[in-house]
């Protein structure tokens, strides 16, 4: 059935099972995606292939498509309503895969579709940890879609404190520290009492590189406070008004 769309269609017409598995527990759909065969992939999806069936490693066809950097198949699967938060045997979601493989386009597609940026793998690492580790260009996008910078892994570290300082590039450091500074400005006490928040506070305040960035952010916030409108409000109202929207998906910051 693999590779030839005409023959595959004929076999299906004669009753071939579209969800039959091989010894790896892979479906015909897996092989269509593995060979980047858009026509065959579309056929199997149209005939009702179950996109949420996983192989013996608990990997979905979406994991397979991302592993092959198969953007076309990823689009087809997302449009077909696949569960993008399925976890493999190591707890990695499709978003973990996309971040680790540094595929910005697929990462943005997953986030725009609603993929959860705070799902942990078996080591309790979220995609943000891997984004910092691999110097990903998607850190800002993760933050905008609700990634929690204060989440703690199984070693009691946040994504920032668990990543070697010298590894993180300047842009990503600026994104994380900027978000933390805004959070420090508007967060309620229950957030500030969380372990991850305290860890990041100590790290940022006691690291020269991080604290310098934070000081610049504080200066910019003070400049906003100094800007007065005719209504009597200052520009800091934009920070205050964002408070109702800012704690989304485990307190992920949504403004930059």
From Swiss-Prot:
ANK repeats mapped onto the chain: 1-20, 24-53, 57-86, 90-119, 123-151
Entry-linked SUPFAM superfamilies: Ankyrin repeat (SSF48403)
InterPro entries: Ankyrin-SOCS_box_domain, Ankyrin_rpt, Ankyrin_rpt-contain_sf
UniProt entry tagged with the keyword Repeat: yes
Keywords, alphabetical: ANK repeat, Repeat
Domain of life: Viruses
Transmembrane spans: none
SMART domains recorded: ANK
GO biological process: positive regulation of protein catabolic process; protein ubiquitination
Disulfide bonds: none
PANTHER family: ANK_REP_REGION DOMAIN-CONTAINING PROTEIN, SOWAH (DROSOPHILA) HOMOLOG
Name of this protein: Putative ankyrin repeat protein FPV231
Organism: Fowlpox virus (strain NVSL) (FPV)
């Amino acid at each position: 059935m693999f590779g030839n769309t005409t023959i595959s269609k004929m076999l299906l017409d004669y009753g071939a099972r579209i969800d039959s598995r091989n010894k790896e527990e892979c479906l015909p759909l897996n092989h269509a995606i593995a060979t980047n065969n858009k026509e065959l992939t579309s056929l199997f999806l149209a005939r009702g292939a179950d996109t949420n069936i996983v192989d013996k490693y608990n990997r979905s066809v979406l994991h397979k498509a991302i592993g092959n950097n198969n953007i076309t198949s990823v689009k087809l699967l997302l449009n077909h309503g696949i569960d993008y938060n399925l976890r493999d045997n190591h707890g990695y979601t499709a978003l973990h895969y996309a971040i680790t493989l540094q595929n910005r386009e697929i990462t943005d597609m997953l986030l725009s579709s609603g993929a959860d940026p705070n799902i942990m793998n078996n080591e309790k690492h979220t995609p943000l940890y891997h984004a910092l580790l691999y110097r990903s260009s998607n850190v800002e996008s993760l933050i905008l879609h609700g990634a929690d910078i204060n989440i703690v892994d199984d070693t009691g570290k946040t994504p920032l404190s668990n990543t070697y300082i010298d590894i993180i590039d300047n842009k990503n450091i600026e994104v994380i520290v900027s978000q933390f500074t805004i959070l420090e400005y508007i967060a309620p006490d229950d957030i500030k009492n969380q372990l991850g928040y305290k860890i990041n506070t100590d790290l940022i305040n006691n690291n020269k590189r991080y604290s310098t960035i934070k000081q610049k952010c504080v200066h910019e916030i003070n400049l906003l406070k100094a800007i007065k409108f005719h209504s009597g409000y200052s520009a800091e109202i934009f920070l205050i008004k964002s408070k109702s929207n800012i704690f989304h998906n485990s307190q992920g910051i949504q403004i930059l």
